[in-house]
Amino acid sequence: MSRRTLPPVRILGIGAFGVAVLLSIVGVPVTAAQGTTVFAVRTDGSLPVDAPFDAAWDGARPTEVVLSGQAVVPPRLLVPSVPVVRVRSLVNDDQIAILLEWDDATRDESVLAVDSFSDAAAIQFALGNGTSICMGQQAGGLNIWHWKADWAADLAGRRDIEDVHPAMPDDRHFPVNQGGQGPGPDGFLTGQMAGNPRSAALRTSSVEDLNAVGFGTLTPQTPDGQNVSGASEYRAGVWRVVMSRRLSNGDPNDTVLRAGSAATVIAVAAWDGSRGDRNGQKSVSIWLALSLPQKPMGLLDMWPFLLMLVLALVLSGLVMLYGSRQPAVGLGGPSSRPDWGGGE
């Protein structure tokens, strides 16, 4: 009697199941959210882009997105610091706003100490078909909106090392020019003079607009291309962050957002500064779909259909008029048989 052997497909299935069970036992999430769609809600008037807790957001149903730890490249994160992010979106004729909400026991908005890291969140948009979710690729890049809690705190006034160590002596101090032009000819602040966005003397937004085409290629857009706004608020252990942008801006480095078009492919990520999250150490989702509703049609938009309806009615009327002028056949009218004479 021959021995039965398992087919390769079944062996792989059993192996995958065993790995899943093992990861579940040690507390590592096996998958992130699958096949999730975020439905933007159309609203009339302005969007609450500066008010994360505005009542208008209650009209947008939150989509719960499960995150996994980024475990592809170092610094890795096996267990996500932020397990779930709730995503909502509102849109009008000109603008889109996306709200990210997640639970966080601490409010981390300073990076001035060596061992302090900021809370953060990001939304990435695929710029091509088949784009890798891991920072994109040359054949299909990413447009990334990156909100940083420390940048949000700097909007009220840029903080510096003196805020952490106010009595620290120094040999020579070059004060930062709050006009954003650098410290002047006698100063030497390399980051600011090189135009590093992280060293900027002034913050105009808490969100950085970036692009990437693979690992190690994350690049901020030029100052003129920074067109994403941000607003955030921390309440009772919950972060709410709103990122917004005009739907159409003509920037080739930005994602194209068009109401009623095919769903836009996005992903989200979150960082918990109190747990040392920074750079690649983050909680991430898989690809999601962002669906923007079709713009309601007005009378001007409906003119082709109205024209077709009028033409159809005119043609129907002409057909009926033509038919009414034809002699009736077989309905009691004069006989069409010839008179041969001599008939009965």
Task: Name every feature range the model reports, one short phrase each.
Residues 5-7, 27-58, 113-203, 250-344:
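Acidic/polar low-complexity flexible segments
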Residues 51, 95-104, 239-245:
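Short, well-ordered beta-strand segments enriched in hydrophobic/aromatic residues
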Residues 91, 102-104, 127-129, 245-247, ...:
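A mature extracytoplasmic/lumenal domain signature
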